[in-house]
Amino acid sequence: MMYIKNTIQDFVIKFKTNDLNMGEIDFTAEENESSLPVNLNGEIRFFYSHLILNDHPTFYGTFFIQIVESQDLNEILSGWRVQNDTAWHDEYIIFAERNGDVLFCDTRNITSPVYGSIQKRNFIISGSLADFLDVFCSAIEIEQSKYDGDGTDDDFNFREDFLGDIDFMLKGKLKDVEAKGFKQFFFG
């Protein structure tokens, strides 16, 4: 559990370092389980029981996502739980949203593997929530420190060198199929 704890703490730090981010994310060492409306286990349970989330926390920039607050977990899931939908399981927990697409964990596995879903088509992004948080924070670090918070050119297309740097980082941290999923979710 050390790895997930460290990646969550880094996630909070990355959130706080960008003034353009909205809402509030804080880490708490004390387990805060009173407010979990859905059944969680593994890394996603650790995530929600050690984060204080307020005012629709949203990361700004290329890797824009809005984190789902624990009290909203049921509500966001209700739109995805459709009868006779074999592609969607009750064990899927949506933890972030981006323009109507979502990131979710499969709680059937203790590591909480992360998937992206674009127009209800699901694909793997990482073998664990900790791995996702690690690459997400690394991607933000690249965008903020090397590209001054903007990986696009004058025509708002992603810069080739920016995409290359993200690609290189992903190759070092994820399986190829996962890296492809990460890029599909954030770059289309």
Which role does the model predict for each range below?
Residues 71-80, 111-115, 119, 145-155:
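A short, terminal or domain-edge coil/loop segment
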Residues 99-102, 109-110, 120-122:
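Short, solvent-exposed loop/turn segments at secondary-structure junctions
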Residues 96-98, 108, 117, 128:
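Structured loops at beta-to-helix junctions and adjacent beta-edge loops in soluble globular domains
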Residues 137-168:
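Mixed-charge (acidic/basic) macromolecular-recognition segments
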Residues 54, 101, 111, 139-142:
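Short loop/turn segments at secondary-structure transitions that flank enzyme active sites
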Residues 1-104, 147, 168-188:
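A surface-exposed partner-binding patch
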Residues 113-146:
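Compact, glycine/acidic-enriched structural inserts
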